[in-house]
């Protein structure tokens, strides 16, 4: 999965913020500190994992193989989204931003990710793309933007990857199509 390790980092950030202390980062996790585990996740995403998750060196966005997000599982078959899914980029941004509190290199990288989201995910008029479709090895700049409206783009706002008020309003307005009494659908009609 591309998202679960990043959710661990975001959940840790939320805990640190709620506790008002980063002491949990020194907790022992099988011989490594939690801090070391989180840094290891980021570094493996940067270098590339054995299962194909890798950072695009040009854009700093994360490539995700098919069937690696919550939405495109293979059993049963879901919505294939091989390439650069927007929620993975939002989680990646948040992970880097959190670790950037202690390591300036990660903060700088998070800013590159935010700039790439702005550059590549808003190519279609009136839309934030759900995914930039690409095969392994294809950079984000050559990926094909997806115009489907899905709730994944909301993470770009809630995790702080998109902060421009006009872009945030665009995402929220488009997501209104997904609202139903009591919740939000995963796909528009």
Regions found by a protein language model. Give the residues of each.
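Acidic/His metal-coordination segments adjacent to aromatic residues that form catalytic metal sites
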Residues: 1, 61-83, 134-142
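Inter-helical turn/loop segments and adjacent helix faces that build the functional surface
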Residues: 15-32, 96-108
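Replace the tail clause
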Residues: 24-75
């Amino acid at each position: 999965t591309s998202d679960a390790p990043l959710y661990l980092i975001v959940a840790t950030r939320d805990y640190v913020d709620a506790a008002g202390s980063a002491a949990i980062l020194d907790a022992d996790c099988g011989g490594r500190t939690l801090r070391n585990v989180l840094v290891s996740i980021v570094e493996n995403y940067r270098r590339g994992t054995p299962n194909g998750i890798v950072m695009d060196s040009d854009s700093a966005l994360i490539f995700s193989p098919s069937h690696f997000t919550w939405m495109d599982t293979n059993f049963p078959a879901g919505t294939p989204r091989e390439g650069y899914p927007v929620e993975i980029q939002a989680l990646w941004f948040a992970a880097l931003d959190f670790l950037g509190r202690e390591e300036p290199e990660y903060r700088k990288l998070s800013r590159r990710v935010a700039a790439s989201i702005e550059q590549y995910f808003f190519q279609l008029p009136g839309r934030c793309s759900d995914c930039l479709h690409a095969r392994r090895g294809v950079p984000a700049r050559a990926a094909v933007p997806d115009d489907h409206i899905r709730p994944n783009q909301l993470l770009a706002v809630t995790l702080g990857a998109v902060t421009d008020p006009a872009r945030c309003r665009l995402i929220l307005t488009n997501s209104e199509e997904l609202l139903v009494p009591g919740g939000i659908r995963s796909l528009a009609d």
